[in-house]
């Protein structure tokens, strides 16, 4: 496995692999890898000749009061995991390598106005910009994203379609702990008490799934989910919403495929979870 830190050396490797006719898969990450990331890397390995993992804490997707400096980092552990999973390259640039003197950004209207975009207004602009850069640097045939970040996945798919990137976007299932908590790098922030409290998210998901399968109206589904979360004293709801699975706009009834998503603060840590329902 190789490690690169510059755009130039990464492009050189990619160019050689392309000359050899090899397919390239990209797994974009912010590092501090867990089993959720590992599942993406395994899938990428199954479907491509070359596996590239980007390990970059992207500053442009963090707001001024968010956890950029506190975000967990452990590149040694990340590289060992990637090597054990058969990755061919980790691209691990410094921020100044990715952003010299930036004036151009990529943003997606409408899809980024709801859910996480409502309370994190610059987040998806930063995500789309860095993912576009990675696509241009690595030129992958396929790129892999987890469905835990369902809004991000929808936005990236739309960006790829609208900007004519010749890349297949592969969404992969949410990976959970044995007790149901969705895997997240931010779980490391939680104290033992908060870790226990965080299970209200997966309980709310289960409650919502059961309710929606019974044909209960959208607002009642959300009300039941909110009640589960509000019963936990350490939890503070950012949002619990039901949106159209394609355009991320709120819906009042379940007449087409929907995404039911939530963001909840457990203490100071913001966690997300979701489920999809297909009509």
Q: What feature does the model see in each segment?
A:
Residues 219, 224-279:
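Phosphate/ribose-recognition catalytic cores of enzymes acting on nucleotide-derived substrates
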């Amino acid at each position: 496995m190789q490690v690169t830190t510059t755009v130039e050396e990464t492009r050189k490797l990619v160019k050689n692999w392309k000359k050899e006719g090899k397919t390239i898969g990209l797994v974009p990450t912010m590092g501090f890898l867990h089993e959720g990331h590992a599942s993406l890397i395994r899938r990428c390995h199954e479907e491509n000749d070359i596996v590239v993992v980007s390990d970059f804490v992207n500053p442009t997707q963090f707001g001024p009061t968010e956890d950029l400096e506190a975000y967990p980092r452990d590149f040694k552990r990340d590289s060992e995991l990637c090597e054990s999973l058969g990755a061919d390259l980790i691209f691990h640039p410094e921020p100044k390598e990715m952003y010299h003197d930036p004036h151009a950004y990529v943003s997606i209207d409408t899809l980024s106005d709801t859910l996480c975009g409502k309370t994190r207004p610059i987040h998806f602009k930063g995500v789309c910009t860095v993912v576009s850069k990675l696509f241009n640097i690595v030129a992958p045939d396929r790129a892999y994203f987890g469905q835990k970040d369902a809004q991000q996945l929808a936005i990236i798919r739309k960006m790829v379609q609208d900007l004519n990137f010749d890349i297949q976007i592969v969404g992969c299932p949410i990976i959970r702990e044995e007790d149901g908590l969705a895997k997240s790098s931010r779980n490391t922030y939680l104290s033992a008490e908060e870790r226990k409290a965080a299970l209200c998210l997966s309980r709310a998901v289960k409650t919502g799934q059961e309710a929606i399968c019974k044909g209960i109206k959208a607002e009642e589904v959300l009300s039941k989910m909110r009640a589960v979360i509000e019963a936990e004293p350490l939890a503070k709801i950012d949002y619990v919403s039901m949106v159209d699975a394609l355009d991320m706009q709120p819906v009042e009834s379940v007449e087409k495929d929907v995404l039911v998503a939530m963001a909840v603060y457990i203490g100071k840590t913001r966690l997300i979870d979701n489920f999809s329902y297909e009509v």
